[in-house]
């Protein structure tokens, strides 16, 4: 749904109409449109909700809950992206999980738009799929990094075996040269 559609179905729509104020202007201002951020849901200075809702009120609690959902999804996405980028930097093939992780970024964008419905259930419908994708991508990244460590250990062991064989051959050649004299 579009932000305006979500807002028109929200409880805030009716209240703002009764107050005679345009819905968007209450949170986003009228002429000096504020840059949007997740902080608009917080209880801090940049909060759009704190102007009308105390942190302990139902509206304040909903804003905190919605912010928590957004932060969880954003953190999950960033954590998965970081582990996949580490694996990619190490030379491992992670293009498919990185591509799939784009779904989590899309879910984050949709979740931020779903805030305009002021309904945790609507927000959760966007957040949950993104969390699943992020968790799956993170697990694949960790598995890839584990595989990298396995490969490195295998390389070290095979290098030691080859070194031992080379040293053995050198010693055998010297031994044969001494006998030949």
Language-model features: locations:
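Inter-heme linker and motif-flanking segments adjacent to c-type heme-binding CXXCH motifs
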Residues: 1-75, 79-82, 86-96, 110-121, ...
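Juxtamembrane/start-of-transmembrane alpha-helix segments at the extracytoplasmic/lumenal side
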Residues: 141-161
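Alpha-helix boundary/capping detector
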Residues: 78, 130, 156, 160-163, ...
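Juxtamembrane interface at the cytosolic side of transmembrane helices
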Residues: 163-181
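Juxtamembrane amphipathic/hinge helix adjacent to a transmembrane helix
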Residues: 106, 114-148
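Long, amphipathic, charge-rich alpha-helical segments that form helical bundles/coiled-coils
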Residues: 98-112, 154
């Amino acid at each position: 749904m579009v932000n305006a559609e979500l807002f028109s179905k929200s409880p805030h729509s009716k209240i703002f109409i009764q107050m005679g104020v345009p819905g968007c202007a209450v949170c986003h201002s009228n002429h000096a449109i504020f840059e949007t951020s997740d902080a608009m849901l917080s209880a801090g200075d940049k909060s759009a909700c704190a102007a009308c809702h105390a942190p302990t009120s139902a509206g304040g609690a909903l804003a905190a809950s919605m912010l928590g959902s957004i932060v969880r999804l954003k953190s999950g996405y960033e954590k998965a992206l970081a582990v996949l980028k580490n694996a990619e930097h190490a030379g491992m093939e992670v293009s498919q999980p990185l591509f799939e992780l784009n779904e989590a970024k899309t879910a984050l964008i949709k979740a931020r738009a779903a805030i305009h419905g002021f309904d945790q259930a609507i927000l959760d419908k966007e957040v949950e799929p993104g969390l699943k994708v992020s968790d799956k991508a993170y697990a694949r990244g960790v598995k890839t990094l584990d595989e990298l460590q396995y490969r490195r250990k295998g390389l070290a062991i095979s290098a030691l075996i080859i070194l031992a064989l080379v040293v053995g051959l050198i010693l055998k050649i010297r031994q044969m040269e001494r006998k030949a004299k």
